[in-house]
Amino acid sequence: MTSLQILADANIPRVEDAFGQFGTVRRMPGREMTTSDVAAADVLLVRSVTPVGPALLDGTPLRFVGSATIGTDHVDRDYLRAQGIPFAHAPGSNADSVADYVVAALLGLARRRGGALEERTVGIVGCGNIGGRLARRLSALGMEVLRNDPPRARAADADGTGHGFVPLDTVLGAADVVTLHVPLKASGPDPTHHLVDAAFLDRLGDGAWLLNTSRGAVVDGDALLAARRRGDVAAAVLDVWENEPSPDPALIEAVDLATPHIAGYAYDGKVRGTEMLYEALCDALGGEARWAGTDAIRPASADALRGRAPDPRLSATEWRFELARQAYDPAVDDASLRDLVKLGPDARGEAFAHLRAGYRRRREMQQHTVPGTAVPAEHEQAVTEGLKMKLD
């Protein structure tokens, strides 16, 4: 096989380990990639910060494009198809990471605001890899779960199979937590650009919480800011923002939890994404797969990710919050983003990108182990199915 030139986003982990068998790997910041950079490459590996289309690719010799992301709204797939360039992405690679984030965020909100998650109904808008897993985990934490996914509901109706999905109006009328897990689509039968607008927010029930970990433009930031200032949305959690990498500082200050687009940034999910692109390139080129991502994410020792059971005298919410934060505490990422509020737009954009590029090596909750004998019986399902931690 001819040696290939591989251009990769600098923030894709283990890319040299995985793709080195195919040729030379060059890494650079995804936001800085230009046509002249791509012109020297046979393989292009990107993340969501690199728009992939004719403006970047026209006249280049690419043989393969991969995006280490779940979403593909930054990729002109019709253009790639017309050019005969194979494309792969990584659906589901960071689904557990995003679910970890939502679980941790909800436990934190419940702890700060009083009350238990078991007393709340959650509406999950978008039930693909992330939303589907999250539905199971939040159910295990005692929440009533409503699922909304029009494309999947239509497909199930066409097949004559049951699905259990409900209309968005039902979610907005009955749920006091709404969490968004949809792709960004500007047109078509189910557009999601500014899905959460003033009308959506007006239909939310009193005391509702809103979480967005999908794409920033799914939420109209101005509408959410106005609603928060009126007190119409009781709590808001945003990991994604319009105008990234320079989000509106007023909106950062207005929400309860603000993080720099890192919900899916657990190291396990990142490496899983690299592995999925690697396997896709092997298939495209007929090469033998010699690298496995599982070797890269194995803990250094059996005790490396061992947690400790919290004080059994704590309330259920406090107990589960204290255990979850041993694996991941989103308040740490919230503090780092709030430090950017006083910066100007350009400096804020650079700092936002730096937070993502230099993100710590967080591990998924399912990689963590807790002594089984120290877990009270009433928490066992919450630990193993809600937090996805292992008992030993």
UniProtKB/Swiss-Prot annotation:
> Main localization of the protein?
cytoplasm
Q: Does the keyword section mention NAD?
A: yes
Q: Which GO terms describe its biological process?
A: 'de novo' pyridoxal 5'-phosphate biosynthetic process; pyridoxine biosynthetic process
Binding residue positions for substrate? 48, 69, 265
Q: Give the subcellular location.
A: Cytoplasm
Q: Which residues form the active site?
A: 215, 244, 261 (proton donor)
Residues that bind NAD(+), according to the entry? 149, 239, 264
A Pfam family reported for this protein in Swiss-Prot or TrEMBL? 2-Hacid_dh_C
Identify one Gene Ontology CC term for this UniProt entry. cytosol
Instruction: Name the pathway it acts in.
Output: Cofactor biosynthesis; pyridoxine 5'-phosphate biosynthesis; pyridoxine 5'-phosphate from D-erythrose 4-phosphate: step 2/5
Q: Does the keyword Transport apply?
A: no
Keyword line: Cytoplasm, NAD, Oxidoreductase, Pyridoxine biosynthesis
PANTHER family, per the entry: FORMATE DEHYDROGENASE 1
Similarity comment: family membership: Belongs to the D-isomer specific 2-hydroxyacid dehydrogenase family. PdxB subfamily.
Task: Please report the name of this protein according to its UniProt entry.
Answer: Erythronate-4-phosphate dehydrogenase
Which classification does the entry list for the species? Bacteria, Pseudomonadati, Rhodothermota, Rhodothermia, Rhodothermales
